[in-house]
Amino acid sequence: MSDYIIKVGKRKTAIARAIIRKGSGKFLINGYPIELYPIEILREKMLEPIRILGDRSKEIDIDVNVHGGGNTGQADATRTAMAKAIIEYFKDSDLEAEIRAYDRSMLVNDVRRKMPKKPMGYGARAKRQKSYR
C-alpha cells in the first residue's frame, strides 16, 4: 500500500484534489482546518464522508486543495474527493455501499454545466422584451 492516495472531485468549475494518508484525524482545506471553514452549512456538507466513516476517521489525515468555482461548488467537489479517497484508502465495500446509500453524489462527479448565453438575450434563457409599438 502506498503512503498516500490522491483523488479528484469536480462540481461546476470547482476542482478538488484530496490527499489521504495515515495520520491522526486532521482534515485540511487549502491548508486550513476544516473546522475553521466560515459557512456552517457547507462545512457540515464537507464533513459528511467523515461522519459516515465514524471512529476510523482518527486513523487518517486528509488534505484537500480546491480551486475554481464558488463556495457551494467547492464544497461539493471537496466532499466528492474526500469520499472517493476514503473508499480507496480503506478498500471496504460495506463502507462504499453505506456512502452510496447515504448520497450517491458523494461518489459521482456532477456533470451539469452552465448553459451558454444565446444571441439576442441577456443569458441562456432570458430574452429582451419585445415591443409591438
UniProtKB/Swiss-Prot annotation:
* One GO BP annotation of this record: maturation of SSU-rRNA from tricistronic rRNA transcript (SSU-rRNA, 5.8S rRNA, LSU-rRNA)
Top-rank lineage group of the source organism: Archaea
Work out whether the entry's keyword set contains Protease.
Answer: no
UniProt xrefs under InterPro entries:
Ribosomal_Su5_D2-typ_SF, Ribosomal_uS9, Ribosomal_uS9_archaeal, Ribosomal_uS9_CS, Ribsml_uS5_D2-typ_fold_subgr
The UniProt keywords, alphabetically, are: Ribonucleoprotein, Ribosomal protein
Which residues are the signal sequence here? none
What Gene Ontology molecular function terms does this protein carry? RNA binding; structural constituent of ribosome
**What GO terms fall under cellular component here?**
cytosolic small ribosomal subunit
Pfam families registered for this protein in UniProt: Ribosomal_S9
Q: Which family does it belong to?
A: Belongs to the universal ribosomal protein uS9 family.
PANTHER family tied to this protein: RIBOSOMAL PROTEIN S16, RIBOSOMAL PROTEIN S9
This chain belongs to the protein called Small ribosomal subunit protein uS9
The species this protein belongs to is Picrophilus torridus (strain ATCC 700027 / DSM 9790 / JCM 10055 / NBRC 100828 / KAW 2/3)
The gene behind this protein is: rps9
